[in-house]
Amino acid sequence: MAKAIPRVGSRKNGRISSRKSARRIPKGVIHVQASFHNTIVTVTDVRGRVVSWSSAGTCGFRGTRRGTPFAAQTAAANAIRTVVDQGMQRAEVMIKGPGLGRDAALRAIRRSGIVLTFVRDVTPMPHNGCRPPKKRRV
């Protein structure tokens, strides 16, 4: 019977550090999804593999406070803090959604020191697709 090949990254090999922290990422893509109820910030490399992510909910905001601009700013700062440590210097920003956290997240990204190559709005616009929700009567 053939000898089993040890798997890379198994605990028997004694490899403790994670693979994600070892990667150096000079350029990446920052995706900001701002809905009315939450803001999710995902940082990927150029090929689309997720390096870091954060949301207003994971930052400790609950209920209606998750949709606030301050929560979006905190989520963006948390997601970017880890990738700056990994050496990210340039990034593209893709913003999606109509939420309040769009501008606040972009402000936090600009303040982080990463050079932004471009900022693109990728909000999906329907060509008269689904019927929108009814208007609120307060």
From Swiss-Prot:
Keywords: Chloroplast, Plastid, Ribonucleoprotein, Ribosomal protein, RNA-binding, rRNA-binding
A GO cellular component annotation in the UniProt record: chloroplast
Compartments reported by the entry: Plastid, Chloroplast
GO biological process: translation
Keyword Zinc recorded: no
Plastid among keywords: yes
Domain of life: Eukaryota
Region entry Disordered, spans: 1-23
A GO molecular function held by the record: structural constituent of ribosome
InterPro entries: Ribosomal_uS11, Ribosomal_uS11_bac-type, Ribosomal_uS11_CS, Ribosomal_uS11_sf
Pfam family membership, one: Ribosomal_S11
UniProt main location, coarse: plastid
Basic residues biased stretches: 9-23
Description of how the protein assembles with itself and partners: Part of the 30S ribosomal subunit.
Family to which this protein belongs: Belongs to the universal ribosomal protein uS11 family.
NCBIfam families found in the cross-reference section: PRK05309.1, uS11_bact
Matching HAMAP family: Ribosomal_uS11
Stated name of the protein: Small ribosomal subunit protein uS11c
